Amino acid sequence: MLLNQYRKPLRIGVGGPVGSGKTALLEVLCKRMKDSYQLAVVTNDIYTKEDQRILIDANALSADRIVGVETGGCPHTAIREDASMNLLAVEELISKFNNLDIIFIESGGDNLSATFSPELSDLNLYVIDVAAGDKIPRKGGPGITRSDFLIINKIDLAEYVGASLEIMNRDTNLMRKGLPWSFTNLKTGHGVQSVVDFILRQRLYLQ
């Protein structure tokens, strides 16, 4: 849910199931936006800082702008019921870089019911992937129906898993009821600009 009062930096939660492409999305977004905006990232993993390492190795941003949080428990608890570890990571980044425009907060892989605390994020992006099957949009859940922007990733795999993009398009429009979403292929960049454009529009709106 969009906040009425803009907090600088804009905090964007990125959620979705394991393997849907959250980290890959952040890599692409950071590389596309970092020349024009001051960015930072907080990643969440249960027992490791693997997603932090992936983003650093990919040169998504400089290493000091990417903070890894080991939640040690259920992924949605760390972004919803007790977001204290993530809030601390956000505050540390703000203290270190006083000119940040956007902080992305990537949740650990979770189910379709995961949501971010409004204390933690101003906008929520949710990532699912075609490889999970064309039934996923109609399963619903807050990530599908209420996220500010839904990304349906890995469209290049549709033919290999027997998923119909036409069915996913129909069901997503029904479930989203006018809220924005996009198909993406993060390997080719297909659909990424629509995500960037949405972020920038909301940033202006919330100022």
UniProtKB/Swiss-Prot annotation:
Kindly give the Gene3D superfamilies that the UniProt entry links to this protein: P-loop containing nucleotide triphosphate hydrolases
- State its location(s): Cytoplasm
What does the entry list as the binding residues for GTP?
G16, P17, V18, G19, S20, G21, K22, T23
Q: Quote the Pfam families the UniProt record gives.
A: cobW
**UniProt GO cellular component terms:** cytoplasm
Q: Which UniProt keywords apply?
A: Chaperone, Cytoplasm, GTP-binding, Nickel insertion, Nucleotide-binding
A Gene Ontology biological process in which this protein takes part is: urea catabolic process
Q: Which InterPro entries match?
A: CobW/HypB/UreG_nucleotide-bd (IPR003495), P-loop_NTPase (IPR027417), UreG (IPR004400)
Any one GO molecular-function label of the UniProt entry: GTPase activity
Report whether GTP-binding shows up as a keyword of the record: yes
Q: List the disulfide bonds.
A: none
Question: What domain of life?
Answer: Bacteria
Functional note: Facilitates the functional incorporation of the urease nickel metallocenter. This process requires GTP hydrolysis, probably effectuated by UreG.
The similarity annotation says: Belongs to the SIMIBI class G3E GTPase family. UreG subfamily.
Q: How does it assemble?
A: Homodimer. UreD, UreF and UreG form a complex that acts as a GTP-hydrolysis-dependent molecular chaperone, activating the urease apoprotein by helping to assemble the nickel containing metallocenter of UreC. The UreE protein probably delivers the nickel.
Q: What is this protein called?
A: Urease accessory protein UreG
